[in-house]
From Swiss-Prot:
This is Glutathione-regulated potassium-efflux system ancillary protein KefG. One of its GO terms (cellular component) is plasma membrane. Interacts with KefB. InterPro entries: Flavodoxin_fold, Flavoprotein-like_sf, K_H_efflux_KefG, KefG/KefF. The gene is kefG. Belongs to the NAD(P)H dehydrogenase (quinone) family. KefG subfamily. One of its GO terms (molecular function) is NADH:ubiquinone reductase (non-electrogenic) activity.
Length: 183
C-alpha cells in the first residue's frame, strides 16, 4: 500500500482563538501523520517571514492546503504577504521557478455569510468561484494542480454537529488527499 501524499496545511487566521469553526476543522488535521499544520500567525506575529524556511517546507510536501477565513474577498493580510514573498519568481514562477510544478493547491475557506450571498444578483455580486479566481490563477502561475475549494459558508452560524460533520469529511480527505479528490 502506498503512502498518502504529504500535506502542508498553511493555517492563517489572525483571531484563531475566536474561530470555533476553524478550530473544529483543524482537529482532524492534527491527527494525521501525513499532515503538517503550520500556523502562520503563531509563527510570524511580526509578519517577518522566513522565506527560505517556507520554501523548504513547500518542497517537502505534495499537497498545499490554504485554510483561512475569507477577509474582504481575499485572505488575511499575513497570508497575502506569505504568497507574495514565498511564491517568488525564480522559485515558483518565471525562469527557473519550477519548485511547485505538479503539486496540488486546495483552498479551505470559512465565510461569515451564507452561500446565497455569493451570486451575481446577491449581496456580494459575484459567485465564490469568481471571488477565489486570484488563488486559482496563483496556482496556475506556479503550475500547480488546482483542486476545488472546500468552503464552509456562514461558519459561525453552524451547529456543533454540522461543524463536526464538515471536520469529519475534511479529515477523511486529508488522510488520502490526491486519490480522494473532492470532499
Amino acid at each position: 500500500m502506498s503512502q498518502p501524499a504529504k500535506v502542508l496545511l498553511l493555517y492563517a487566521h489572525p483571531e484563531s482563538q475566536d474561530s470555533v469553526a476553524n478550530r473544529v476543522l483543524l482537529k482532524p488535521a492534527i491527527q494525521h501523520n501525513n499532515v503538517t499544520v503550520h500556523d502562520l500567525y503563531a509563527r510570524y506575529p511580526d509578519f517577518f517571514i522566513d522565506t527560505p524556511y517556507e520554501q523548504a517546507l513547500l518542497r517537502e510536501h505534495d499537497v498545499i492546503v490554504f485554510q483561512h477565513p475569507l477577509y474582504t474577498y481575499s485572505c488575511p493580510a499575513l497570508l497575502k504577504e506569505w504568497l507574495d514573498r514565498v511564491l517568488s519568481r525564480g522559485f515558483a514562477s518565471g525562469p527557473g521557478g519550477n519548485q511547485l510544478v505538479g503539486k496540488y493547491w486546495r483552498s479551505v475557506i470559512t465565510t461569515g455569510e451564507p452561500e446565497s450571498a455569493y451570486r451575481y444578483d446577491a449581496l456580494n455580486r459575484y459567485p465564490m468561484s469568481d471571488v477565489l479566481r486570484p488563488f486559482e490563477l496563483t496556482a496556475a502561475m506556479c503550475r500547480m494542480h488546482w483542486m476545488p475549494p472546500i468552503i464552509v459558508y456562514w461558519a459561525r452560524r453552524h451547529s456543533p454537529q454540522t461543524l463536526a460533520s464538515h471536520a469529519k469529511a475534511y479529515g477523511e480527505w486529508l488522510a488520502n488527499p490526491v486519490s480522494a479528490g473532492g470532499y
